[in-house]
From Swiss-Prot:
GO terms for biological process: translation. This is Large ribosomal subunit protein uL30. Part of the 50S ribosomal subunit. Keywords: Ribonucleoprotein, Ribosomal protein. One of its GO terms (cellular component) is large ribosomal subunit. One of its GO terms (molecular function) is structural constituent of ribosome. The keyword Repeat does not apply. InterPro entries: Ribo_uL30_ferredoxin-like_sf, Ribosomal_uL30_bac-type, Ribosomal_uL30_ferredoxin-like. Belongs to the universal ribosomal protein uL30 family.
């Protein structure tokens, strides 16, 4: 299975509580933090909910 890297590009300050929970589920706590995940529909769905805050790094 392929892997993707997700980077937090915008601060969590000002984000709604629901968006913060999504970022918590990804483990992204600080700006510029990068995590690697298996490319699953669940992870893609979380990324789709906060596209303005995260970027997929190749």
């Amino acid at each position: 299975m392929a892997e993707i890297k997700v980077k937090l590009v915008r601060s969590r300050i000002g984000a709604s509580p629901a968006q913060r929970k999504l970022l918590d589920s990804l483990g992204l706590k600080r700006r510029e933090m990068v995590k690697t995940f298996k490319d699953t529909p669940a992870i893609r769905g979380i990324i789709a909910k906060v596209p303005h805050m995260v970027a997929v790094v190749e």
